[in-house]
Amino acid sequence: LIYSDQITTVSPTYAEEICTYEYGYGLEGLLSERAKEGRLNGILNGIDNHEWDPETDKAIAKNYSVKTIRDKSRNKIAIQQHFSLPEKEDALVLGLVSRLVSQKGIDLTIEAVTRRLDAGDNIQLVCLGSGEANYEQDLRVLRARYPDKVGVTIGYNEQLAHQIEAGSDVFLMPSRFEPCGLNQLYSLRYGTLPLVRNTGGLADSVVDSSDENLKNETATGFKFETATTNELDHALLRAINLFSRPRIWRKVVITAMEQNYSWEISSQAYE
């Protein structure tokens, strides 16, 4: 860091965050100096638009595009069938593909989703991941309490990850910190609205569904600020409410799918 001509991070917001005490881990002074000198820059990661393309993806039940967005619902049925959940088109399906660790906000997810389930909201949760034993067990317990609302696979399966991206309505990423993140970019591509904490690359790639952004038709997902159960729960409620307005929801989905976060775009910033 001292002798580098240039320093890059994987998102602009993370480049700012590492100049603070909270994220700098003792290097915030040096990094702040490099930022003032114009030698610290954040460049958002990109994704492979060929590997992650709902129009050609062989791992999903039914291919679709912006022009054939109705076919996305076939993938929702497929993921409900995979997890032995009732085939309910009007249920808001929340997807989670993640390491089950504190950094990813898994505890917040379990607590907030439990609140919504206890309240009787029409949601379903489908999870794929592995990690800390206590979180794995908490998810198993939640599945046992709500077998018609929660599906859990402990481990990782690439095909299932693609199907969750295609079949979910909302993708959960309530990370405590996230230098860039890729799943929110996959989710945008697949028209699955990311629900994220406003940090790192999540902040740079998701536009919140605020009233103003909905009016301007720039919204692509949902954001919340503080890593607390209450804030995540409030964001979930906003997603549930917007899902009950299908015409507006569809517009947000289309806007999300029209975003381009491919490496072809990101690589230009390195030139």
Outline where the language-model segments fall.
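Catalytic cores of nucleotide-sugar-dependent glycosyltransferases that transfer UDP/GDP/TDP-activated
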Residues: L1-E271
